[in-house]
Amino acid sequence: MVDEATKRTLAAIPLLKTRAGPRDKDQWVGRLKEELVSLIKYVENNKKQDNDWFRLESNKEGTRWFGKCWYVHNLLKYEFDVEFDIPVTYPGTAPEIALPELDGKTAKMYRGGKICLTDHFKPLWARNVPKFGIAHAMALGLGPWLAVEIPDLVEKGIIVHKEKTSSE
Amino acid sequence: MANQTASLIEENQQLKAKIQELEDALAKKSAQHRVKITTMSSEVVDSNPYSRLMALKRMGIVKNYEDIRHYTVAIVGVGGVGSVTAEMLTRCGIGKLILFDYDKVELANMNRLFFRPDQSGMSKVEASEATLRDINPDVEFETHNYNITKVDKYDHFVGRIKSGGLQGKPVDLVLSCVDNFEARMAINMACNEINQMWIESGVSENAVSGHIQVVIPGQTSCFACAPPLVVADNIDEKTLKREGVCAASLPTTMGIVAGFLVQNTLKHLLQFGSVTHYLGYNAMKDYFPTMALKPNPHCDDSFCLIRQEEYQQYLAENPPEAESEDPTEDVVHESNEWGITLVDETPESEKKEELDPDLAKGLARAYDMPSVEQVRILVKDSTESQQETEEPVSLEELQSRLKGL
């Protein structure tokens, strides 16, 4: 269900401890700190392994997240805006990651550009509450989605490479 | 010149005739809107929209049909199931409907019931209200076009459940007609917190199975008590092709599930028949599993545990008189000169099922919750990372560090 490489990536992402959602005032601040530590570590790991593939930041409350993610296919870099809200039920349910500009371009999406996750993602998330956080959702959800969908969308000519986005 | 004037006059006349024609059509259409009816009548005449419903009283099915006007039902999700649910309750003459949805009508919805192509682009709640008001102006409507799982909308949602009913009372029943786990969990969380009964409904992504599940906080299993139940549809996952699609849907399955949902809503509100905790539908085999569901004493939802405690206390103070829920009266023998007694011959193995009910045939959990050890194999607990979180770093500093990467 989860390949070896993903397992190794996952194992290197710090786990979280606090079971608190955005409605849990003080505890949420603690959870948010854990999220940030975990995300920073994950991005650093990615950089070290020459596999840097996203940037995220949030509003002050940590309830709305946005940034960029990119995927390299045939030596060309395809970049997309990524965004999601932290639902009131978090971390009991995972965030629903969206790539709004791809909305309507692939059937593997729900309204608003929310990515369609595999059957394995939700059970895996449910079994790891509250240890999984945003970094895990990116690694297990968006990462594999991009790896499958972007090459396919490029082959079909649905997305084309934009020159400007290729410079880093 | 004269020619031109003549043709203009002719055009003018044609336009006037067209306007008259359209005005007549419009007048005819608005004349079709019926006026509000103050009391439900059981008179059997063509002009009475409630005659066939009130006939339920005459036939002895329902004692108090007109009471339906005192009830408020909140429907969360006005899609394939929710819109049909709303239409059924509107036609039944429900007192008030509160609709929640943040989606718009699209042509891709036209394989389902209720919405029309000309409503494309309208918000689902707005389009629903227009159609429903036309069908039955006696019903009161309240609509909210937002996502209930969002932090800034959730409190408003909970508030409307608590006081959106007629005369500011809590709503009588919440119906979940959403298409995702997150929204179901949000409804569950809200209803556990404010002790509100609700009914969950769902259709599988392959469109050939569905279910409804009654949640009475503390009494029956809540949505967080265990992984969701799924109706086994006898389709091998390996042969199910998911390439290029997220979900399929059929108007049939959705209509059937909406029918189940409203039937049980009516039975609960008007107190006739019995309401099953869980009713499944397997379209491939025409199989309908039913079962009772007990709450999980180790549920992750803290309010579920509070409600369970309250219910246990209630049971202790009000011990149930008879175990049988069946309203058929027991035959009482006034004398028993032969000392005849009934001996329970149920084997021990079968008795166990009642205490800890195994899943009904044809039902399964969406996934298992594995033991702690299994989780550890999947994700190694890295002790070094846990030490990092102990560092006294401010939230702002971490946020700027992430931003600065």
UniProtKB/Swiss-Prot annotation, chain A:
Catalytic machinery residues: 116
> Sorted alphabetically, which InterPro entries does this protein's record hold?
UBQ-conjugating_enzyme/RWD, Ufc1
Q: SUPFAM superfamilies given for it?
A: UBC-like
Disulfide pattern: none
Q: Which GO terms describe its biological process?
A: protein ufmylation; response to endoplasmic reticulum stress; reticulophagy
A Pfam family matched in the record: UFC1
Q: Any idea which GO molecular function terms this record carries?
A: UFM1 conjugating enzyme activity; UFM1 transferase activity
For this UniProt record, the keywords arranged alphabetically read as follows: Ubl conjugation pathway
> Which family is this protein grouped under?
Belongs to the ubiquitin-conjugating enzyme family. UFC1 subfamily.
Question: What's the stated role of this polypeptide?
Answer: E2-like enzyme which forms an intermediate with UFM1 via a thioester linkage.
What's the protein called, per UniProt?
Ubiquitin-fold modifier-conjugating enzyme 1
